[in-house]
Amino acid sequence: MAIILPDLPYAYDALEPHIDAETMTLHHDKHHATYVANANAALEKHPEIGEDLEALLADVSQIPEDIRQAVINNGGGHLNHALFWELMSPEETQISQELSEDINATFGSFEDFKAAFTAAATGRFGSGWAWLVVNAEGKLEVLSTANQDTPIMEGKKPILGLDVWEHAYYLNYRNVRPNYIKAFFEIINWNKVNELYQAAKA
């Protein structure tokens, strides 16, 4: 059973004007599809390790060395993007009271969290991701990862993530990454974030 490219949970133009349809089409149909194809090609070389990417990336030492980086790059790329699509919504959603209180306790206020997340996304040199995670101690934490590395590799559970590779925003925002980050906060699917938060804390 090969890894499958998931459908977008909304139309390509559903997130406009924040993310344009052309960007969504290229991002999903080309970039994400390539990660899926390359992850499958790598895993086919070692069928004995299976296809559970979350389990494999939680302990990359178990991935045979000849495909390890390919699985990190492409398996991570698939997991990150499959989550990313679900973390956005054209519908207005609300953060849960429990998560809101945890954010306030951890960062001081929602605005302080937003500033920390924005700093992580803006400060990531080159390509990568910004994340809100639940760490091994059950605490919220903001961090960024390079390339397609996933917080799962650090034993952390991502509940919100933003792709800051240029392919995610360049058509619409050119080199002004902060405007893209600001737009992202307008389309966050808090229903999904709340769900991931509850699962991570369980």
UniProtKB/Swiss-Prot annotation:
Cofactor: Mn(2+); Fe(3+)
Record-listed E.C. numbers: 1.15.1.1
Cytoplasm among keywords: no
GO annotation, cellular component aspect: cytoplasm
Record GO terms (molecular function): metal ion binding; superoxide dismutase activity
Free-text comment on the cofactor: Binds 1 Mn(2+) or Fe(3+) ion per subunit.
InterPro entries recorded: Mn/Fe_SOD, Mn/Fe_SOD_BS, Mn/Fe_SOD_C, Mn/Fe_SOD_N, Mn/Fe_SOD_N_sf, SOD_C_sf
Protein name: Superoxide dismutase [Mn/Fe]
Source organism (scientific name): Streptococcus agalactiae
Gene designation per UniProt: sodA
